[in-house]
Curated annotation (Swiss-Prot):
Lineage: Bacteria, Pseudomonadati, Myxococcota, Myxococcia, Myxococcales
Entry-annotated residues carrying 2,3-didehydroalanine (Ser): 131
Biological process (GO), any one: toxin biosynthetic process
Superkingdom assignment: Bacteria
Pfam family, one: Lyase_aromatic
Protein known as: Tyrosine 2,3-aminomutase
Record keywords: Isomerase, Lyase
Any one GO molecular-function label of the UniProt entry: ammonia-lyase activity
Record family assignment: Belongs to the TAL/TAM family.
Gene from which this protein is expressed: tam
Residues bound to substrate: 71, 183, 288
Modifications after synthesis and translation: Contains an active site 4-methylidene-imidazol-5-one (MIO), which is formed autocatalytically by cyclization and dehydration of residues Ala-Ser-Gly.
Length: 526
């Protein structure tokens, strides 16, 4: 099972029968301990700073239901369905480990909701990221007790209305079940998993745009040679250099370094004096440094995938139920610092792709440095026609906005809960910002690739490499040569629609042979 397939592809989930028996055994063990009054957090105590309040067994369901209702305190806009599905998928997987005390019936009901497209309404704001994602997961769990609201087929309705139509029965929770549902990192991890998937696609698009612009600008092939890049020792740099060679193979537009040297020699061979030429031995950084810039982006994504995948497959509850009350682990597995820091790293990597794309766009448009292309790629009479001048404003403004979004969240802890939660991760904030960055950089790359498609009309289009010609062909169908005859926003939206939807994902994957694990995989067994 992989998160993206369930969240975006709407693939259903099926719970492993053998693992459910382990879940049941742990659940029954906790119910017995609760009746025997073994002191255990969330079983017979209050929550958070109220841990010193002991709750007798007759209030077991009240305690759990009160937790869900009181902590369903989220605010802001609700998450879209695909993020909600990712959250539900990760929470089911974590609870299927069998260390939380949840009942199989609760997991089956969550899975049924997921498979039938019944999505809890989960507000985006309200999580501190430790003790897990209490607010969003409380909203996720409310429908299990017949409370809250759900969204089905895009319509938000009270839970019980939908349950009655679907023949579903809400549950009465036992000892610790409410706490098991909400005391974990599954909201930030679900959101982070989607951000990671989108970031990987943006990296492929960044490579395609980079391979396009070096041809449009007749850049040198030398910066992408294996020998020089391998000496830097970073594997990501070597991979990106190889991909740049692959994506530009067969081009008739780039310049060989030996040819550049020869041209300089011929230009200066008859003079022994200082002489300024119009020939540049090296290109500007935005045409030369892709292996170094995108190489570290690649390695950052790989590191973040490890953190996020490990968290998605972890036991992130508290307490963690072991064989006896004495062994049961009262700790802090709910803390989201791994995911929070992974998202901060990921947000910087995504923002850097936006920085590169914005600078490449400027080099493509600036009439002082983009020769022989027309200024701002105007189709005729530059000045009367503006070309992509307006599109650049959008890209530049978003790149600036991204600098704020890329600031770390994981170090911005504010104590809460009577000083009990005195160092928290803010992991869901970090994940939300990373999702926003992915949207923003997708727009910057859409402007750049629309401009590159325009630039191909002013160059020898047949001399581009095969992968880039296929991109131009695809984009040309929705965004033909721009002649100021329609709003620029329409062009950008059309290109964005191609690049960032499923057809764009498939095309980029087919063209960019990037060895990334394709999915964030889940394993319900411990």
């Amino acid at each position: 099972m992989d998160i993206y397939a369930v969240a975006v592809g709407r693939v259903g989930v099926e719970l492993d029968a053998a693992q459910l028996e382990r879940v049941r055994a742990t659940h029954l063990r906790v119910q017995g301990w609760g009746m025997e009054k073994y002191p255990m957090y969330g079983v017979n105590t209050g929550f958070g700073e109220l841990i010193n309040v002991i709750i007798p067994p007759q209030f077991k369901s009240d305690l759990q239901h009160n937790l869900l209702r009181s902590h369903a305190a989220g605010g802001g806009e609700p998450f879209p369905d695909e993020v909600v599905r990712a959250i539900m998928t990760v929470r089911i997987n974590c609870l299927m480990k069998g260390y939380s005390g949840i009942s199989p019936e609760a997991l089956q009901l969550l899975a049924t909701m997921l498979n039938r497209g019944i999505h809890p309404v989960i507000p985006m704001q309200g999580s501190l990221g430790a003790s897990g994602d209490l607010a969003p997961l409380s909203h996720m769990a409310l429908p299990l007790i017949g409370d809250g609201h759900v969204r089905k087929n895009g319509v938000t309705r009270p839970t019980m209305e939908v349950f009655q139509e679907e023949g579903l029965t809400p549950l009465k929770l036992g000892f610790k079940e409410g706490l098991a549902l909400v005391n974990g990192t599954s909201a930030m991890t679900g959101a982070a998993s989607l951000a990671l998937y989108r970031a990987r696609h943006l990296l492929r698009l960044s490579l395609l745009a980079s391979a396009d612009i070096v041809q449009a600008m007749n850049a040198s092939t030398r910066p992408f040679s294996h020998t020089g890049n391998a000496l830097k020792n970073h594997p990501g740099q070597v991979v990106i250099a190889r991909l740049m060679r692959d994506l530009t193979q067969g081009t008739g537009l780039m310049r060989d370094h030996q040819d550049i040297m020869r041209a300089i020699s011929e230009r200066t061979s008859h003079s022994n004096d200082v002489e300024e030429t119009e020939i540049y031995l090296q290109n500007a950084y935005s045409l030369r440094c892709m292996p170094q810039v995108l190489g570290v982006v690649l390695e950052t994504l790989q590191m973040c995938q490890r953190f996020i995948e490990e968290e998605a497959n972890s036991v992130n509850d508290n307490p963690v139920i072991l064989d006896t009350p004495a062994e049961t682990y009262h700790g802090a597995n709910f803390h989201g610092q791994y995911v929070a820091m992974a998202c901060d790293y990921l947000s910087i990597a995504v923002a850097e792709m936006g920085v590169l794309a914005e600078r490449q766009l400027n080099r493509l448009l600036d009439p002082h440095i983009n020769k022989p292309l027309p200024g701002f790629l105007a189709h005729a009479k530059t000045g009367l026609f503006c070309g992509f001048e307006g599109g650049q404003y959008l890209a530049t403004s978003i790149a600036s906005e991204n600098l704020d979004l890329a600031a770390p969240s994981s170090i911005k802890s504010i104590p809460s809960n009577g000083q009990n939660q005195d160092i928290v991760s803010m992991g869901l904030i970090a994940a939300r910002k990373t999702l926003a960055l992915c949207e923003n950089v997708g727009t910057i790359l859409s402007v750049l690739m629309a401009a590159l498609n325009q630039a191909s009309h002013f160059t020898e289009a047949a001399k581009y490499s095969a992968p880039i010609r296929s991109i131009h062909e695809k984009l040309g169908k929705v965004a033909p040569r721009y002649e100021d005859e329609r709003p620029m926003s329409t062009v950008i939206a059309q290109v964005r629609g191609v690049l960032l939807q499923e057809q764009g994902l498939a095309l980029a994957q087919s063209l960019v042979n990037l060895d990334l694990t394709p999915d964030l995989s889940l394993e319900p067994r411990a």
